[in-house]
């Protein structure tokens, strides 16, 4: 029998932003029930960037939203700096 979705403690998120893919893994600590995340960005030019949360979150949704914002901001910063700020 499958475990209840509310009891899951690990989720994988795969998405892209500005044609750059990123993957994140959200994990809930079994002792504190707080969520953390780590992930990586695969830039189209072959460079990769790994990242991890430096804090914990009360809910999965809060952790996922923060992780997505972090990845999108990192992608934007790298792409904007590599082309002189032009889209």
Residue positions per predicted region:
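Short N-terminal "domain-start" leader segments
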Residues: 1-38
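Short intrinsically disordered terminal tails
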Residues: 1-3, 81-87
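Extended hydrophobic/Leu-rich segments
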Residues: 3, 11-13, 57, 63-67, ...
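Short beta-strand elements
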Residues: 39-43
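A short, exposed loop/beta-hairpin motif centered on an aromatic-Gly-Thr core
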Residues: 45-65, 70
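Short arginine-rich
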Residues: 69-81
